[in-house]
Amino acid sequence: MNLFDFFRANKKPSTASVAKERLQIIVAHERGQRSTPDYLPSLQKELVEVIRKYVNIGNDDVHVALESQGSCSILELNITLPDR
């Protein structure tokens, strides 16, 4: 290694630092998805079954979302009903 190479500003990042950065992005993404409760998919499935007793709908016609605002949690339920 040359003495001038040591002081160069345009060094390429090492593969280890690139791998570390990518892993941090993946971990942050996984943590973001864990914020939804485990019961949400089963709740959506059961809601579809109950609504199907009265109205003909598909699995994609019911959307369930849970939002947290401070100490309050809001369960949002959107149902697309067919035209009569």
From Swiss-Prot:
Top-level taxon of origin: Bacteria
InterPro entries: MinE, MinE_sf
Keywords: Cell cycle, Cell division
The organism's taxonomic lineage, starting at the top: Bacteria, Pseudomonadati, Pseudomonadota, Gammaproteobacteria, Pseudomonadales
A Pfam family reported for this protein in Swiss-Prot or TrEMBL: MinE
UniProt family annotation: Belongs to the MinE family.
The protein, known as: Cell division topological specificity factor
Record function comment: Prevents the cell division inhibition by proteins MinC and MinD at internal division sites while permitting inhibition at polar sites. This ensures cell division at the proper site by restricting the formation of a division septum at the midpoint of the long axis of the cell.
